Amino acid sequence: MSRNNNEKWWKKAVVYQIYPKSFQDSNGDGFGDLQGIIKRLDYLETLGINAIWLSPVFKSPQADNGYDISDYRDIDPTFGSLDDMEELINEAKKHNIRIMMDLVLNHSSNEHRWFKEAKKSKDNPYHDYYIWRDGDEGVPPSDMKACFGGSAWEYVPEIGQYYFHQFLPEQPDLNWENPKVRRAIYDMILWWMDKGVGGFRLDVIDQIAKEPDKRITINGPRLQEYFKELSRETFQKGNLITVGEAWGADTERAKLYSNPDGSEFSMVFQFEHIGLDQKEGGEKWDLASLPFKKLKKIMAHWQNELYNCGWNSLFWDNHDLPRIVSRWGNDREYRVESAKMLAILLHGMQGTPYIYQGEELGMTNVQYDIEDYKDCEIINMYHERLEKGYSKDEIMKSIYAKGRDNARTPMQWDDSANAGFTTGTPWIKVNDNYDKINAKSQVDDPDSIFSCYKKLVQLRKDYPVFVDGKFTLLLEDDENIFAYSRKNEEKTMIVVCNFFDKEIPMPLAKECEGMEVLISNYKDTSDMSVLRPYEARMYIR
């Protein structure tokens, strides 16, 4: 079934990402859950979002934050039950919100029934659901490394074979070359679609067509074939939003994956802009200042290359990234102004914007003692770098800037104990600034960051130029300003953002003369000669 523009509801949509563990606890155990999300649907409807992307809630031993799924048709008891999930899907619909699930199709948990069967014998019908190679103990089939370190091969002495895993040993890779695996996956997706799920985010989806013997782990030769079959057998049977996480995608691949003919996915997540503030050739912990002109160039490249032949996802934050207002804004003196500027800058672009929980409040990074962090990546890095001779101060500076727990502190609902997240002891400490930064203080304040996001969500629905306007980068070489225009047959929009904390002359005064200000982050926009610190203006005519 081809999907015409009317059916592509996600082009006008804004998606809200929820990290369930940290969103809202309903039973006092300190962990967020599905009933907690149901309790907060009114808040999300007020914001105006159209879909919720739920980070993994499937049954899982939680070796990798739920990205190790042991049962694709059940919910992890931490978050509730299958009944709770069905209730969330149905209640969200009443608020005009669809639910997107976070689906891992590259690998399962080693606790999954398929894998438990697969390792019993080479003749087991599930054996070929995974990738096995013969070998002697201690002599793996190759020296390939897993993404999280160590060998990509794990020995099972009972059958004298190694299985392949690109991530943890607890995450054996599924064998997509086996048509039975693909059929089982499609049946599972259709089962969720029957329950009313409105879309899927597909984790590391560009790694499913791996060929370990040839050392191919990403963008394998059969990738397009698998994508098209997956879409044909499942997604095209419903009007779904689908986003493929593709760390290895350039714009050419992204055009294939998000082809307007609807044969693969609605859009992709690409991360080219996300690694800019780290040293060349280093890890994310090796901090560097943001090369501002390069950021502009990369974002413009994705806007222009995918115009009319693909679709962008627009995001600053997710559950793995630091808070954008602390990262590229100013979370002290200009927190409100810089948070709004970053929102206006991103939401004026073409694509589907993603708001990560708390981003709409300007939630900030945290600075904890090492004992208070929960993320295994942070803890492992801390010990590794101490051994390598880094100073504790250096290491903590990197953790404060880039640690994943920055995104995972509990949602700040109000100024009561634990920010209204739980009546118990939260699984991770609440940010100390919850008494000043919280939803309760912002929802009814017309000048709040929340109200800025709410207005941006509505503007995308009201003005077609947000969806179909052609993007042109302006002032490409300007060291302080990120400006661009969007133009369709009816309207021209100009977005001008001062990215830094100094007042500067407004270089586009003539171009913007006589245009209406759609949204800005300062009340008075009558002075066309200067831009104040972090000032953002969106003009239209």
Describe the residue ranges of each PLM region.
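Active-site and adjacent substrate-binding regions of carbohydrate-active enzymes
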Residues: 2-541
